[in-house]
């Protein structure tokens, strides 16, 4: 429900952008002139369809491209997804002007972009191996526990704010992050539930925890572009 309410609120903000399109809202004038919005998407949330090559969501609850397409439809421009394997690559895309917007968690170190208000809450949890004593997310915040995480991902930012004792073990993308767990270099793998459910069959006896922690997702815009604040 929280995801839906945030998405509805964000869509309402998009509607305000379209209200004055006859005189072209200055916040989107450059997008209208270009005729397109280039949207950076993180590969942990979207993957390439092996048959069509198109980007598709990792789960039905991920609606970031749908939000971008709503904006595109409101202002009458094409939406062009641009996939990035890592968040730093997406930030570079925004910084050099190769992307117009992207979606990511907030972080003070992410200069060079403007953030909207939060538009979604995503659910994060852990994949743990067979025989693990970790039954709940809070159980993992102990000295000596190693949590495999994707560097700079929103789930990693969320955990780093709330966990005080566990050690984060970083990898660049989900596949090597899972390998840290599979090769016993980590005690848990933290990510979006849908991603973890995809990896669980590759590690016999593993399980995805039932409880969750949540974190916000924001739209990030190239500086001096629209900030979507009403």
Q: What name fits each language-model region?
A:
Residues 28, 54-59, 111-120, 207-211, ...:
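A structural signal for short loop-to-beta-strand junctions that line the ligand-binding cleft
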Residues 88, 103-114, 158-161, 182-215:
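A ligand-binding cleft/hinge motif common to bilobed small-molecule-binding domains
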Residues 21-105, 111, 170:
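Extracytoplasmic small-molecule ligand-binding "clamshell" domains
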Residues 43, 120-131, 176, 193-230:
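Periplasmic-binding protein-like
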Residues 77-92, 134-135, 169-179, 183, ...:
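Short helix-initiation/N-cap motifs at beta->coil->alpha
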């Amino acid at each position: 429900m929280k995801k839906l309410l945030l998405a509805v609120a964000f869509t309402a903000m998009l509607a305000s952008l379209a209200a004055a399109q006859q005189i072209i809202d200055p916040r989107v004038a450059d997008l209208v002139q270009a005729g397109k919005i280039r949207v950076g998407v993180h590969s942990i949330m979207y993957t390439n369809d092996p048959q069509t090559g198109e980007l598709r969501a990792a789960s039905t609850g991920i609606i970031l491209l749908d939000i971008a397409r709503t904006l595109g439809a409101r202002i009458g421009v094409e939406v062009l997804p641009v996939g990035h394997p890592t968040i730093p690559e997406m930030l570079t895309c925004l910084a050099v002007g190769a992307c117009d917007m992207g979606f990511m968690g907030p972080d003070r170190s992410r200069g060079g972009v403007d953030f909207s208000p939060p538009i979604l809450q995503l659910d994060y949890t852990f994949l743990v191996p067979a025989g693990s004593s970790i039954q709940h997310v809070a159980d993992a915040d102990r000295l000596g526990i190693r949590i495999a995480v994707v560097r700079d991902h929103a789930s990693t930012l969320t955990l780093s704010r709330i966990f005080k004792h566990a050690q984060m073990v970083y990898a660049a993308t989900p596949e090597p992050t899972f390998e840290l767990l599979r090769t016993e270099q980590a005690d848990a793998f933290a990510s979006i539930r849908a991603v973890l459910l995809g990896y669980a069959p590759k590690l016999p006896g593993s399980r995805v925890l039932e409880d969750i922690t949540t974190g916000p997702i924001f739209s990030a815009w190239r500086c001096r572009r629209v900030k979507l604040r009403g």
